[in-house]
Amino acid sequence: MNAAVIDSKHSQDFIVADLSLADWGRKELDIAETEMPGLVQIREEYKAQQPLKGARVAGSLHMTIQTGVLIETLKALGADVRWASCNIFSTQDHAAAAIAKGGTPVFAFKGESLDEYWEFSHRIFEWPNGEFANMILDDGGDATLLLILGSKAEKDRSVISKPTNEEEVALYKSIARHLDADPVWYSTRLAHIKGVTEETTTGVHRLYQMEKEGRLPFPAINVNDSVTKSKFDNLYGCRESLVDGIKRATDVMIAGKIAVVAGYGDVGKGCAQSLRGLGATVWVTEIDPICALQAAMEGYRVVTMEYAADKADIFVTATGNYHVIGHDHMKAMRHNAIVCNIGHFDSEIDVASTRQYTWENIKPQVDHIIFPDGKRVILLAEGRLVNLGCATGHPSFVMSNSFTNQTLAQIELFVEGSKYENKVYVLPKQLDEKVARLHLARIGANLTELTSEQAGYIGVDKNGPFKPNHYRY
């Protein structure tokens, strides 16, 4: 790789912001490894077997330092990898540089345009020497969507003829351009995919929809619903990274403010805890009576967005839904209200409706939306993931849980893929418990061991699994 590659955003080898950041990135990768015991131990356990030898992984997941450790783990187990970020703002440029310098084709930099984002999503499927990706590692489902929608458009271009938002404009234009060059670009690549492992709630929802409709073209493992992912990454990760993003972006004092968390799933629970821990009065909006009751029993006030809009100071969406905060909500907000999203896509806040007003950029990923009456609303990360757009995402330790699950899921689908139908699966309980076990020593936790008599009394193997699949942690 030569100097031209460093400066060009049109290289066929990789596209990163600045390769000179690689040494900094390598130092942070080394530090992160000390906080990612699951991935490190999986490398040691499987490196001799090389279970991913022959796997060509197309990865679409936030290109962070922690993701760099995941990529190097996949490669240590035999995989070839090409990588793009799954969000235009989430890349850490020094991480991308370090991974690119290490020989992995990476197509990611912080602040991509939507056109660049979808071009990079294509690049992870463009393998040299006539080869094709045979595995997808996805976060949010965009890589999976790209091949499936593109294959559909090969037969009927009308499916990409009516975009409804700026994201679809860029996506459809990108697909049309590739079809003009190769009318079977997508179906050719789709035919080689053995399966996908999906990281997040939003992407999993897409997979289940396709399974229900009979449109899922390959097996999928739902990594998100592994207990050691959803109850750790989603809850404890967001509990730390949400306020990190808000405070880096705004320097606001959270104590004494009224903060609204839209959605009280695992992500919302972590967000509410962190805001209350810093002294905010936390209100929750919910559609689900069970989650609403949970929030109320934890001492949060459960309200509607219509009620809260003109009263609260900080708004956080964590629903995975559409237009949870709409134009009229923002129009009603107080001067300098802070609005942000920690769900995967930018559709939770109706950002498009505010483009009619004046925007004033304060610094990267921090904008004032100036309404006609002079009131300003502070929008973070343009409504995209605030913890990755305005900070560095979840801590390494909790991401080790998630990425150990991802690695085990990739191994399972690649090695045992023939036994799976085109359905969505979760990892077995034994592997979930294994992931947790790998992380205990790092934080000084010691397990109590059942005696044979105790195991027999409750009807479990003394080495686990300890809970039935229906158990709710």
UniProtKB/Swiss-Prot annotation:
It is found in: Cytoplasm. GO terms for molecular function: adenosylhomocysteinase activity. The keyword NAD applies. Substrate binds at residues 64, 139, 199, 229, 233. Its cofactor is NAD(+). The keyword Hydrolase applies. Keywords: Cytoplasm, Hydrolase, NAD, One-carbon metabolism. May play a key role in the regulation of the intracellular concentration of adenosylhomocysteine. This is Adenosylhomocysteinase. It comes from Paraburkholderia phymatum (strain DSM 17167 / CIP 108236 / LMG 21445 / STM815) (Burkholderia phymatum). The lineage of its organism: Bacteria, Pseudomonadati, Pseudomonadota, Betaproteobacteria, Burkholderiales. The gene is ahcY.
